[in-house]
């Protein structure tokens, strides 16, 4: 984790609980629910892999790299980091003395006709000084705690950027795989349409030869129109998906280059999930929640120390003379030193309310931290079972498609042999088309579940 030893101490209760098998009062499971029982439980995890080691399609990698530069959410996150870093500088500056230098020279000529004594004389007065403005001695550590809170907020904003990066990588990969699936659907629809048009031609020829009825022709036409109708709908989805990917990558709507087709995209047969305890170190949203907790604990300390006296110093050192020629001589030296102690006595309950507010914010940060951890475990468990079951569904769907393909061929052979009706052959063709579409979607779902699992395990920001 990126926190310093001081930050560790600030969340000591959390770390101690982790060593005891709990975090923020919640038990840390020894393994993820839904993990492959045949895989050994160790510290390796797909979440430790860099995104380009998981998604190996060249065109997909180009899209991800473009998104890393142009994506609006990422650019917003970077701007927030810059703001948080500036806030650290502001907090740190309050711990340091602030100096100012100044000089003034005044020349006065007194009128001869006025009432002033010494009329007609010209007088010059000058001064030059170096001063430090109200420097507070941080006796109780209030300013140090304020700076500590600002630094924790900076680290939290850096972790937030990593969280956004993980989301962007997942969104680009998910959109790309969905686009490839639509390409496969379009190819299947066009091939099916061509096949059905050929069947219609043959059936029309059989009708002319007295071997088929007008009803047979109409039924064949129905399948042609059904296949033809799906094509513009798929093309619409393709363009909309391309537009969405263009937006994620920070570009105007346009075509998206493709790499390998859907059925050639690599998946992992065995996905190691790693140890649940390592997830707490890997996921940036958990680390951000921890840093927010560190910041809120520091702000509680700041609010409490506001009851204590504040000691501030103000000083000035310089030269002053009514004659410029003597400005830098010894007798012209001047200095001022003003120590000041301020003790709040009555603030109308403001300081007590500040403490209550800070404590409430700290409790909110604790709850958010607990919720973030619990949600992380849930997301991993959901993604693991999704990945496993989608692979099982795809395997069964492949068997179903093979069976329906054989059935369709046999049904047409029986129809052409005159031992079965055309309706059975057309029904077989319709069921085969639907099953092939479902198989294409199951291939997409397998890749999408891999994306979701990678995100849930904290991958994508490395």
Segments from the language model and where they lie:
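Regular, well-ordered alpha-helical segments
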Residues: 86, 93, 159, 166, ...
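C-terminal structured "cap/appendage" subdomains that terminate the fold
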Residues: 408-440, 446
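Periplasmic alpha-helical coiled-coil/stalk elements that build and connect Gram-negative outer-membrane
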Residues: 2-3, 143, 152, 159-275, ...
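A short glycine-centered flexible hinge/capping loop motif at secondary-structure junctions
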Residues: 207-211, 415-419, 456-460
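Terminal intrinsically disordered/low-complexity segments used for targeting and assembly
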Residues: 1-69, 151, 235-281, 287, ...
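Short, acidic/charged, Gly/Pro-enriched secondary-structure junctions
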Residues: 75-93, 102-106, 294
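Sec/SRP-type N-terminal targeting helices
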Residues: 75-76, 92-93, 137-165, 215, ...
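Small/polar, glycine/serine/threonine/aspartate-rich low-complexity segments that form flexible
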Residues: 39-56, 60, 65, 104-132, ...
